[in-house]
């Protein structure tokens, strides 16, 4: 099915074949989980080229492709296979191929090389049932990790302690790793939207923003919760309530048929109406799947239309330099008539 859809896209882009070098796209199209190899797909043929280390693995994991072990360089093997396929124009993934690599391909491959982008990424936006099973499990593990960490956080421990405990807990649940460098931003560091865990000690009266996820079977979850350690100030509680109301409004309103711009506007307009528009400077959300950030974007620039089986985050935040910040994030699945939450952790302000 994936090859059929890809071949339809090749026609649209007027190329005879696509050279897949982006590792996420390679995994999506072939199921191969190793770290070296490229795929070349034409209208009638599909070949996967890898080296001695991965031939056996490729033969086990990949269906529908010829597996070729390159003896010369991988680029020379691509040139050879392209000749055999008799293709005139090959699309290459311009957003992924470094210029130096392109020069080597240009020198060896006789077919015309045409820069293309977003072909496989577009297919990846709409999830299959198999993908959704994995994404839901990744979300559940993140929820369980949040429950666990709430009993661990206390004054005097560092942000790094919290990040390490989160990662260790998730790995014990069978994940490969966290989805990305875990964000633990306490106190005034909460004003940093991407405040990766530091050696700062967590103190009483602070809010702590936890942004993390699980990389499970190749797919990721991405959840954010902000908790209080001891009683927070009225100001901090106030921005918490605004952020939560904005996030809940977006969850209620987002449905298929709207653009990323429209989906972004619900939380943004609400936060603006409360006087914090300037303090919410990032987009409302992004697609999740094999990558932490993929299409579609829920942002003031995104024309992409939401359709069922897309999976996205909804994560408004308010950041006050010198004071602190709040972000609340869930992963959702776009359904036929609205959306379904994949992350279910409580969003009331927990006082730990």
Model region roles, listed by residue range:
Residues 1-352:
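Active-site neighborhoods and metal-handling regions in enzymes and metal-associated proteins
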